[in-house]
Amino acid sequence: MTSSDIHENVRAYYREAARTGAKELAADGRWGASRYDDDTLARVPSAAADLSMGCGNPHAVVDLQPGETVLDLGSGAGLDVILSARRVGPTGRAYGIDFLDEMLHIARANAAEAGVTNAQFLHGMIENIPLADESVDVVISNCVINLAPDKVPVFAEIARVLRPGGRVAIFDVVAEDGLDRVTDASTDGNQWANCGAGALHHSAYLRVLAAAGLVEPSIQYTHNTGPGRHGAIVRARRP
């Protein structure tokens, strides 16, 4: 399976989710809105929470400040962008990037319903972020980077758009070192699209962060997502 094939499988999987919803993920406890507290979810449109497909809550670990610019990679229905926009306030800015027009349409409607005016949703690939160099203070993401066929350009782009001193605070699925693939990702695109086959091993993840020039990398497991795989907080900083 080529990188293009993987992208198409992921695109088809999440396009269908945009059409049918993802509320059942929250019942699992490992995914989606279940990773957020009820008070937080009560303050956002239900359509944003119902389409949450992440593996954590970036806002539990990132200390956003008023006036900051934050970027959410793979912003989906807009939940984390809406929360970010409120935390950075009217002097700040929250961007979301997604490669699906269907998700962008939903996210923009959710932001409008939430009364958020300092958020912008952009069409693009996380391997080619449509923002200027050194334009962002914080990059967040929620169970999206594992979907990329090649993580190296993703983190190179993250480093490019971060300002000096900017920080990374993302949730992703990370595989334990030594774990064999559960399935052959070259023939089963669904295992990639549902956050299985694309997970980097722990040590490989740290190497990719370092190769991008990011410093103080750390990975903290939060919960199991499958055999040998974990939802994890990934942190780093641009020097």
What do these predicted regions represent?
Residues 212-239:
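Core SAM-dependent methyltransferase catalytic element
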Residues 1-34:
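N-terminal auxiliary segments of SAM/dcSAM-dependent transferases
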Residues 197-212:
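Short alpha-helix
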Residues 139-140:
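Hydrophobic beta-strand segment of the Class I
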Residues 174-196:
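Short, glycine-/aromatic-enriched active-site segment of Class I SAM-dependent methyltransferases
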Residues 152-167:
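A short glycine-rich, Lys/Arg-flanked "PGG" loop and its adjoining helix->strand segment in the class I
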Residues 65-128:
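Class I SAM-dependent methyltransferase SAM/SAH-binding core
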Residues 30-69, 83, 87:
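Conserved alpha-helix/loop element of class I SAM-dependent methyltransferases that forms part
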